Amino acid sequence: MEKITLFHGTSSRIVVPTYGLGEKKHDYGKGFYLTDNLNLAKEWAVCKPDDENGWVHQYKLDTDRLKILDFQEKDVLSWLAELMKHRDASDSRRYRVLSKKFIEKYGIDTEGYDVIKGWRANASYFYIAKEFVRDNIDMDILTELLSLGGLGIQYCIKSRLAYEHLQEVQDGLLSVDYMEFREKYNHRDVSARQKMRELIDSDANKVTNVFSTLL
């Protein structure tokens, strides 16, 4: 039996993880999202610009008998295809047509998995995604771009079994100061975007092996 410690950053003091709930338009669809990085959880707890302190809930996940899909072990295009299933990087007709083809070619069937593990698509990701679908980013620099984003790794609890294996640590609730961690969240995003723009504008970006050529 292997138990891992995970954290859920939120503006809510009371959280009840419930099977079947969650937003369809989150990165991996409906589910309960956590991270194994406490500092990132604190930043995510205050990512909404409402000047309210946040909360971090601590959990233990018993991974015994759980089927986990880890996108870090897959091609980055498979991860992008999964995000395209749930989130729109553009509202253009071109994107709607090409993203469907992209998902068909690179997407993974996630049905049957109890937990999905992978990068979190924050604001920096959407900057990359928009440039990628516009054919402004070469595939050769895509992985490096994503690493510059400091996206962080998240776990999405999907199945009823996974929810049953998730237990909150009763004395693990932490209060998060809005001003301190909102500043860190903003700094991370600004720094990431600056580094991304520099790489996209560099000679390393050949703009040859681009989104539309991968279909």
Provide a role label for each language-model segment.
Residues M1-K25:
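Short aromatic-glycine-(Arg/Gly/Cys) micro-motifs in beta-strand/loop hairpins
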Residues E23-K48:
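Extended catalytic/binding region for NAD+/ADP-ribose chemistry, centered on the ART fold
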Residues L6-G9, W55-Y59:
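A short beta-strand micro-motif
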Residues T10-S11, L38, L61-R65:
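Short, flexible loop/turn elements at secondary-structure junctions
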Residues E2-I4, Y28-G31, G54:
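Short, surface-exposed beta-edge/turn micro-motifs
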Residues E2, H26, C47-D50, D62-L215:
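Conserved NAD+-utilizing ADP-ribose enzyme module
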Residues K42-A45, E52-Q58:
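Short N-terminal amphipathic alpha-helices
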